[in-house]
């Protein structure tokens, strides 16, 4: 009887020791995952700051684009402004919305840094980022088509290129379109990071 009791005591002790080892091993495995998620969240925050700069640059550059030629006739004054074209007006509105959204998304990005396993904030960001990348690309593509016509014209439609006369105007709108496409690419990278972070959840 005594030997049986001793064997039982030894088995119980070994079981507790194995359980403690399993818990310690599990914590050691989970810690690198938390560190990876936090690193992804920090990179996401940096991308959002960069996207804010790109979207704001696109908005302000396009929104302040205006050029008046130094010569005019008795009845005409040659002027080019962004609000003369609906595509450019849509471009300014879309990038302004994207800029505002990026500012509002910063607190949620910080939450993902502080709490790497918070799935709700990350899921909200990936949904809104997807909407914003669609809006930004649509605006940039529409404006890019107008910029192409301004540079090259269209002989079939008898549309002449205007960039030889309005060179400052064309340079400004071209730069704004490039900045908007950069913002769209940054949005795509943020979506990839969010999807990867959710996959590792």
Swiss-Prot record:
Signal peptide start and end residues: none
Subunit field text: Homodimer and heterodimers.
Family: Belongs to the Casparian strip membrane proteins (CASP) family.
Stretches assigned to coiled coil: none
Membrane topology: Multi-pass membrane protein
Protein name from the UniProt record: Casparian strip membrane protein 2
Keyword Lipid metabolism set for record: no
Transmembrane feature ranges: 39-59, 90-110, 130-150, 176-196
Extracellular topology ranges: 60-89, 151-175
GO process terms (BP): cell wall modification; cell-cell junction assembly
InterPro entries reported in the protein's UniProt record: CASP/CASPL, CASP_dom, CASPL
Pfam annotation, one family: CASP_dom
UniProt entry keywords in alphabetical sequence: Cell membrane, Cell wall biogenesis/degradation, Membrane, Transmembrane, Transmembrane helix
Compartments, as annotated in UniProt: Cell membrane
Entry GO CC: Casparian strip; plasma membrane
Job description of the protein: Regulates membrane-cell wall junctions and localized cell wall deposition. Required for establishment of the Casparian strip membrane domain (CSD) and the subsequent formation of Casparian strips, a cell wall modification of the root endodermis that determines an apoplastic barrier between the intraorganismal apoplasm and the extraorganismal apoplasm and prevents lateral diffusion.
Intervals, Cytoplasmic compartment: 1-38, 111-129, 197-201
